[in-house]
UniProtKB/Swiss-Prot annotation:
Induction: Induced by ER stress caused by treatment with tunicamycin.
Top enzyme category: isomerase
Domain spans labelled PPIase cyclophilin-type: 37-195
Entry keyword annotation includes Isomerase: yes
The protein's Enzyme Commission number: 5.2.1.8
Record gene name: CPR5
Keyword Coiled coil: no
Protein name in the entry: Peptidyl-prolyl cis-trans isomerase D
Residues bearing attached sugar chains per UniProt: N139
Organism: Saccharomyces cerevisiae (strain ATCC 204508 / S288c) (Baker's yeast)
Signal peptide: 1-22
UniProt KW keywords: Endoplasmic reticulum, Glycoprotein, Isomerase, Rotamase, Signal
Catalyses which reaction(s): [protein]-peptidylproline (omega=180) = [protein]-peptidylproline (omega=0)
A GO term, aspect molecular function: cyclosporin A binding
Family, similarity comment: Belongs to the cyclophilin-type PPIase family. PPIase B subfamily.
Length: 225
C-alpha cells in the first residue's frame, strides 16, 4: 500500500513539473507591431534577407529607435550600408555601429544614448533581437541577434524583437571567417533596409505613447542641428 502511495506521489510530482515546463515553453512572445528587414551581402556575395518583428507595445522607445534607423536614408544616421562588426559562433552577431563601423560608435535617435526600457523579454531562444550596450542605460544604435539561448544576458540587455524569417542568413553570418577581434575578415554589409509592415495600434494609450516617443526623437534631432 505504501509503495502504491509513494508511486502515486512520484507520478503526480513528475506530471506537475512537466506541466510547469510545458507552460513556460509555450509562453507567447510579445505582440509584433512592426516588420522590418535587412538585405545582406558578404563582400560582393548576396546572402539573403533577415526579416524582424519588433515588440512596439512592450518596448516602444527601443523599437522606435531601431525602426527609424532601419528606414533611414541618411548616410550618417541609419543602418543602411553599415556592417555586422562582431560575430561569435554559438552566441550572436552584432551590428549597428554606423559611425565607426568597429564597435566603438553609433548613436540613438534620442541623442547619443537612452535608458534601458525594461527586461521583460528574455534571451531564451535563437533569433532574439536585443540592444548592445556599454553597461546600464547606455543604449545607442548597436544591436545583436542571438544564435542560441543566452540567459546570462537577461536583466542586462533589452530584448525588443525577434527574427521572423532569415535565420539561415543569421547562421551564415555567424560562421563567416573572423579575425582576432571577432570581426569578419570580409565585410558583412546591410545593403538594403526598410519596413515591410506596421500593425495599426488599437490601444489608444499605446498609440499616444508612440506619438510622444516620436516627438521626443524629433526634439532630440532638432537639438543636434
Amino acid at each position: 500500500m505504501k509503495l502504491q502511495f509513494f508511486s502515486f506521489i512520484t507520478l503526480f510530482a513528475c506530471l506537475f513539473t512537466t506541466a510547469i515546463f510545458a507552460k513556460e515553453d509555450t509562453a507567447e512572445d510579445p505582440e509584433i507591431t512592426h516588420k522590418v528587414y535587412f538585405d545582406i551581402n558578404h563582400g560582393d556575395k548576396q546572402i539573403g534577407r533577415i526579416v524582424m518583428g519588433l515588440y512596439g507595445l512592450t518596448t516602444p522607445q527601443t523599437v522606435e529607435n531601431f525602426y527609424q534607423l532601419t528606414i533611414s536614408r541618411d548616410p550618417k544616421m541609419g543602418y543602411l550600408n553599415s556592417i555586422f562588426h562582431r560575430v561569435i559562433p554559438n552566441f550572436m552577431i552584432q551590428g549597428g555601429d554606423f559611425t565607426h563601423r568597429s564597435g566603438i560608435g553609433g548613436k540613438s535617435i534620442f541623442g547619443n544614448t537612452f535608458k534601458d526600457e525594461n527586461f521583460d523579454v528574455k534571451h531564451d531562444k535563437p533569433g532574439r533581437l536585443s540592444m548592445a550596450n556599454r553597461g546600464k542605460n547606455t543604449n545607442g544604435s548597436q544591436f545583436f541577434i542571438t544564435t542560441v539561448p543566452c540567459p546570462w544576458l537577461d536583466g542586462k540587455h533589452v530584448v525588443f524583437g525577434e527574427v521572423l524569417d532569415g535565420m539561415d542568413v543569421v547562421h551564415y553570418i555567424e560562421n563567416v571567417k573572423t579575425d582576432s577581434r571577432n570581426m569578419p575578415v570580409k565585410e558583412v554589409i546591410i545593403v538594403e533596409s526598410g519596413e515591410l509592415e506596421t500593425v495599426p495600434l488599437d490601444n489608444k494609450d499605446a498609440a499616444k505613447l508612440q506619438e510622444e516617443i516620436k516627438a521626443e526623437a524629433s526634439e532630440a534631432a532638432h537639438d543636434e542641428l
